[in-house]
From Swiss-Prot:
It comes from the Bacteria. In the presence of PdxT, forms a dodecamer of heterodimers. The active site is at 79 (schiff-base intermediate with d-ribose 5-phosphate). The lineage of its organism: Bacteria, Bacillati, Bacillota, Clostridia, Eubacteriales. Gene3D superfamilies: Aldolase class I. This is Pyridoxal 5'-phosphate synthase subunit PdxS. The keyword Lyase applies. Catalyzes the formation of pyridoxal 5'-phosphate from ribose 5-phosphate (RBP), glyceraldehyde 3-phosphate (G3P) and ammonia. The ammonia is provided by the PdxT subunit. Can also use ribulose 5-phosphate and dihydroxyacetone phosphate as substrates, resulting from enzyme-catalyzed isomerization of RBP and G3P, respectively. D-ribose 5-phosphate binds at residues 22, 151, 212, 233-234. Its EC number is 4.3.3.6. Keywords: Lyase, Pyridoxal phosphate, Schiff base.
Amino acid sequence: MEKKYELNKNLAQMIKNGVIMDVVNPEQAKIAEEAGAIAVMALERVPSDIRKQGGVARTSDPKMIKEIINAVSIPVMAKVRIGHFVEAQILEAIGVDCIDESEVLTPADDLFHINKKDFKVPFVCGARNLGEALRRIGEGASMIRTKGEAGTGNVVEAVRHMRTISSEMRKLQLTPKEELMTVAKEMGAPFNLIEYVAEKGKLPVINFAAGGIATPADAALMMQLGCDGIFVGSGIFKSDSPEKRAKAIVKATTYFKDPDVLAKVSENLGGAMSGLEISKLETEFAERGW
């Protein structure tokens, strides 16, 4: 079990500093691959459409996911509902490279997340704070991402979640060892993971940014805040020029510390996706999960 988990963590490390793009068909997947995406997330509706159309959002049609797998050479991920381990079994059976237990879909279980250690395929999960991140890692997640607020084109929640996780890790490093068990109890997180963060000052897995990233500057901002890579959902294919924006976000993620490059790749991209103000949302996806 431990060897398998270490392998999954190492596989996740291979996509560090890359961009993962949401796609709804093979054509979009090819655009993402040509733009330099390190992986694609296959789903039937991007988060902005899920938010707009409402209803129950479930995992995507396996046939559509397999078509995307066959269309590209890069890894293909797909989403399942929180707690829906049968959807995860189906995705593992059709050969996805990673499963996202995602708050963007309608939760199937309001008590438990999936026990990810039951699967060979690696999982990524969202987190708003250190406690959520460590609980998901304790369940077997090989990768963490900020929850942000998907489908809004508004990066503020992703920034909040990344800053929260970073500040809580710094605080943990300053906590006396005899108090760590109390912290573990308060966070509901495994003690060995609390010890790891207190000693190393970082998560034991990679942490990507997700939720509301719409521009090259957004991607560079999250990288400068300490993220290991970027998920882009609605921000590319809901923009005026998906191909140009996809390439620009990939370049911004690579050269996130170079303002000259960032300025150049931000030119002439056309309109970004229309954004939403968080305070006016009827449903906040980030509140899902625990």
